[in-house]
Amino acid sequence: MFSYSSSISRGVVDCTPELFYQVVRSEKVGKICAEIADAHELKMRGEMSREDFETFKSEHKKRLPVFLFHASFPNGRRISADAVPSGLSIFDLDHISTLPIPLLRTSEKSEGGDAGGHDSLENVLKALKERGCIGKSFSNLPYLFSPSSPIALIHISPSCEGLRFVFRLPEGMSLSDGQKWFAGQLGINDYDVCVKDYARCSFAVPEDYILYVNEEKLFSAPSSSLQPPP
């Protein structure tokens, strides 16, 4: 179980599947992210400076609800000392300048997706690999889209410049160890090593920013059965 808050400054509650979809389908989240996307387009066309875009993005993100994928907080406070680990971890790919938004539009998605318009994990990972977003030569790609895959969620970031992966930690791994392990699975050397706080927030995005979701992995209790590949 992980937590949800209506803003970075509010109390937190447990996030159910119903609440998760209510948030990503909300008019508020869609409107805020659309405004950020419009500003990103202006920046890409040279009509807004990088500095002005960063300010605009930061101010708008503060208005978004947040998920706390790393843990639940029974006391309703976003304090690491109160955290009950969810068994999930997040991994960010930042500043991907070649990333189309959204990467795979619903009308272009291949067979194998779900009823909600999200693509299959295999299709998403192969598309990311082809675009150079993840390692071009590594051996674990088949494992990542197998039934044993740890990946629960992949979505485009609110900034329109990156991706966020949510994945299940193998048994006994800390958040920092999990980051290093997952980077190796993706064939990536440079990543944000600061993602190790149980109280870290993940800003909500609209449902059409979600490239892949596995509800069973996202909402199930921590499992001791997930093991790293050989």
Identify the role of each PLM range:
Residues P229-P230:
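Acidic, low-complexity intrinsically disordered tails
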Residues M1-S107, E111-E161, R168-S176:
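Signature for HUH/AEP ssDNA processing cores
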Residues E171-G172, L186-L226:
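Catalytic "initiation/cleavage/transfer" segments centered on a nucleophilic residue
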Residues H155-I156, V166, V195, F203:
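A structural signal for short, well-ordered beta-strand segments and their strand-loop junctions
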Residues D177-F182:
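Alpha-helical scaffold elements adjacent to nucleotide-binding pockets in ATP/GTP-utilizing enzyme cores
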